[in-house]
Amino acid sequence: MHIDALSRRLIDRYQHGMPLCAEPYRAMAEELGCSEGEVLACLEQLQEDGGLSRIGPVFEHSRAGASTLVALAVPEARLEQVAARINAFPEVNHNYLREHRYNLWFVLTGPDRAHIDALLAEIEADTGLVPLDLPMLHAFRIDLGFPLGDPS
């Protein structure tokens, strides 16, 4: 995937937050020295190319409810079926296949710990697999950004 100069500047500047105003794309364009149409076209292209999955807020989950990292040891023959079932839960995000006995890893979120516990029990009942529940005890550093900078 080719990332042009405008895309790099756009990602570097706004991956940690967008302008909170009535016309955020226009404000972004003004700051970047281009048109609103160029910003929108750039974002569309990034999404089409698979370089951008979504535009939206990221919430501090510990203030809004509960979450946990979950791992399942899924037999290879059942991976697609189990992954599809896990993905059907709206509370699931970041579902990844890993090379390990515990090979399916995902994050569960909910309004409180009781909800998480109920989801874990439902996942176990639905799949016959015992979830490994790994709640975060302390965040040392969380930065979901990846600075691209100038490639030259």
UniProtKB/Swiss-Prot annotation:
Keyword Lyase included in the entry's annotation = yes
Q: Does the keyword Lyase apply?
A: yes
What the entry lists under InterPro entries is as follows: AsnC_trans_reg2, HTH-Siroheme_Decarb, NirdL-like_HTH
Top-level enzyme category: lyase
Name its pathway: Porphyrin-containing compound metabolism
**Domain of life assignment:** Bacteria
- State the UniProt keywords alphabetically: Lyase
The catalytic activity, as recorded, is: siroheme + 2 H(+) = 12,18-didecarboxysiroheme + 2 CO2
Name one molecular function that GO assigns to this entry: lyase activity
Q: What is its EC number?
A: 4.1.1.111
- Coiled-coil spans are none
Instruction: Report the gene knockout effect.
Output: Insertional mutagenesis results in the loss of respiratory nitrite reductase activity in vivo and in vitro. Mutant strains synthesize a periplasmic cytochrome cd1 that lacks heme d1.
**Can you tell me which family this protein belongs to?**
Belongs to the Ahb/Nir family.
The role this protein plays is: Involved in heme d1 biosynthesis. Catalyzes the decarboxylation of siroheme into didecarboxysiroheme.
Assembly with partners or alone: Probably forms a complex composed of NirD, NirL, NirG and NirH. All proteins are required for the total conversion of siroheme to didecarboxysiroheme.
Q: What is this protein called?
A: Siroheme decarboxylase NirD subunit
Species this chain originates from = Stutzerimonas stutzeri (Pseudomonas stutzeri)
Q: Mind giving the lineage of the organism this protein is from?
A: Bacteria, Pseudomonadati, Pseudomonadota, Gammaproteobacteria, Pseudomonadales
